Amino acid sequence: MSNEFWYRLFHGVVRLLMRIVCRMHVEGIEHLSHPAPYLVAGNHLTQWDPPTLMSLIPPTHRLTGIAADKWRKVLPFRLLFDRINVIWVKRGEVDRVALSAVLAALKRGWVVGLTPEGTRSKTGGLQQARNGVAWIAAKAKVPVIPVAVWGVENIEPSLKRLHRTDVHVRIGPAITLDPADSHDASTERIMHAIAAMLPEKYRGVYG
């Protein structure tokens, strides 16, 4: 079976799963219907962030993202992620193979979801972001759609009590970065757009 089949199947399963485990409160969903390709840049609280985003991507768009290379050693993850074209990345270094794969996905007209912070927040607040998203957006000449998510950190505690929890998602309009700006300036613009949509306690260093 083709990877397209597996992606459509997984997309449907994720949408159903998120409806079961939480109550989604979404603002700005129309911005995800922006013509692809584009980048989605969001804060990173838990492993529930990627399925939350995937459940909201319109079926007309194809989404991919990155996963830490360590999960490639876990057979179920490797089999699934390879079939839906997840991009493996080596943490702690500039992974040029992964960067090339992200650019190739955008060139194919896909949507790529990334977290500018690079890793999950241990405090819940935004951490200092890296310049990767800004660099990719400039290189591929694609816009960035900022996304703010909170409440996902309560999914697992609620599931243990057999309760659904409230998950909030705010999606901002596409940002077209100014090519004259530095990557630092572009990263600040993206992160402040995310922070502006988050409740104050989640804004961290961008509060």
Give residue spans per PLM region.
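Non-catalytic C-terminal accessory region of glycerolipid acyltransferases
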Residues: M1-W6, V97-G207
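Catalytic core of membrane glycerolipid acyltransferases/transacylases, capturing the structured
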Residues: W6, R19, L32-E93
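Short, glycine/polar-rich helix-capping loops at beta-to-alpha or helix-loop-helix junctions
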Residues: F10, R72-F77, I155-P157, R164
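Structural motif corresponding to alpha-helix initiation and N-cap regions
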Residues: V26, V74, R96-L99
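N-terminal membrane-anchoring alpha-helices
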Residues: M1-R23
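Short, basic, glycine/proline-bearing loop/turn elements
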Residues: V13-V14, R83-V89, P116-R120
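Short amphipathic alpha-helix with an adjacent loop that forms part of the alpha/beta core around
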Residues: E30-S33, L103-A104
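Short gly/ser/thr-rich secondary-structure transition/capping motifs
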Residues: R19-E27, E93, W150-E153
